[in-house]
Amino acid sequence: MEGTVERLIEAGDRETLARALHDRKYADVPGSIKTGWAFYAAKLGKADMLRLLVERCHGMPLEKDAQGKNLLHAAASSGDRETMAFALRVLGMDALAGDLQGITPLDIAAKTGEEALKTLEELCGVRLSDCYRNPVLRGFRPDPSIVRVGEDYYMVNSSFVMVPALPISHSRDLVHWETIGHVFTDPDTARLRGAMGGFGYWAPDISYYKGRFWVVATLRSSTVPARAQMITSAPTPQGPWDAPKFLDVDGIDPSIFTDDDGKRYLVTNIGAQITPLSDAGDLLGEPRMIWYGWNRIKSEGPHLLKKDGWYYLFIAEGGTGFSHVESCARSRSLYGPYESCPFNPILGKRDEEAYIRRSGHGKPVQLPDGRWAFVYLCGRRVEEKTLMGRETAIDPLDWTPDGWPMINRLKGPSCLQKKFLSDAPVKPNEPWVCPRLSPESFSFLETDGSVWVQGGAELSEMDAAHALMHRLREASVTLEATVDLRQMESGGMAGLTGYYDEHSYFLLVLRKTVLGSDVVLRQRVGDGETEETLGRVSGWEAALRVDGHGLTFTASCPDAKETKTFRAEYLTDEGLQGGKRFSGALVGLAAVGAGQAVFRNIREEMRDVQD
């Protein structure tokens, strides 16, 4: 039966195929095979055959293949206008919808050929060159908050225990972002000493008030009080930032709301609570809850907006994992009562198999022309886990005629989206970061690109680990460097690292001995650590390299002709049970022990699945 149907599809024999589908044997054919027939017809560009199969097989348009591709993906690979038009206009499929790797029908058409892309662009009304890809800020940059001043957009994100802390980014097109500063560069001022991995600065908010930029954030520490709300301001987003105040308000995820009358309020969870705030950032009263949430499960990240006489409250719910969503409520009065949006959740868990998941905790921003956008956190799936941590995405926010917000037309997070504004590209400038320490306190960058790193404690130590790292921004990465131990003492080591926190990391290092250097791979998972010697080299200098693809990494030292392939699920948010695991993986350089290591010929390459 299967071979018969496929031959009829190839031949384009509609009448015979229709009779064959009436055969009672057809009722016993598994649905997966029926779906396979439709995909086959779409890939061949047999529009009549596809239409017949869909008409006779209920539910087929909802099916996807093992890569998460739908019938429009398949039709795009054929380049046939009629087949693509049927999938778009009759089956209602989206040319911007991504598969399990974020690949869209427009991407497939582009690979098929220029004519196929031109045809699909004409049919869907969107040009691939006029689109951007989410996430727009890659590598762990969760809990985004945004403010527009004129035609400039500024964003701040959580940084946890990393220094410099609380990165400030700038954009003029909402897609290309440049890090222009940090609220904290000194770990002592930031009070990050002793903070466990996953603690530190959570969910900041940035706002603009009377000519100054304001940032508030929760400091989650291992001391008392366990949670305090940090507040500071600066004349420019680059700083200098005033000495921070730490407000004794429980809860997390603070934001500042300024009403039409100029009165200011600190907004925090549990649920959404508001506390009057002075112009100087001091508390003027006690917190008062105004709404608990839509599903009332782990509500956090509240942001208030005043529009058309309504107070709109945006709030994240469901926790930081795969149940994370964004909901909304509104009221004519600041203190309520608030009415839940009938479309809740307005962003989040629509497709459990989607490439971009864990979406929520965001903030709206209005463009100069009156349009709206919504920035939010998300997580890209890598082998069912979250390797790059929670990142920042942006989608259009539209308003219904009766005044309710809809993010991306309630379709969930987008992989590909039409640009808001003309491109304003910036030069990438990912800064080095270190847990709890300022990178400048133990490292020095030479003009030739080499880096000196003073040896420090083990990466499992809380306050003295010397590592220079970048956020892992893509699932495929290559990191290599020539490591020179001549100024390290015997027993000291230096090399490359993949790092999540003090309980989850690997080190590929040269360890100095009297006769030369050992090439060692160390892996820390929870409270346990393994060590494997991959080889030995004469002398105290050698090249090291790490290649990662998904959760599989390969460590190598060409001078020792040794390689080791290993799995590093411990670098994901889901890699260990317990603790505060919602930051993200980093890669970089580290030195352990007494003395100094020199890194030369440093090369770091991160590759998107689209490349």
Question: Over which residues does each language-model region extend?
Answer:
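A generic tandem-repeat structural signature
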Residues: 59, 67-69, 73-79, 93-96, ...
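Ankyrin repeat domain, specifically the short helix-to-loop turn at the C-terminus of the second helix
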Residues: 19-26, 51-60, 86-94, 122-125
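Carbohydrate-active catalytic/glycan-binding domains of CAZyme proteins
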Residues: 127-611
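Ankyrin-repeat-protein effector appendages
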Residues: 2-7, 110-128
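Ankyrin-repeat boundary/"N-cap" motif
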Residues: 2-5, 30-40, 64-70, 98-104
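Conserved ankyrin/ankyrin-like repeat signature
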Residues: 16, 48-49, 82-83, 115-119
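Ankyrin repeat A-helix N-terminal signature
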Residues: 7-12, 40-46, 74-80, 108-114
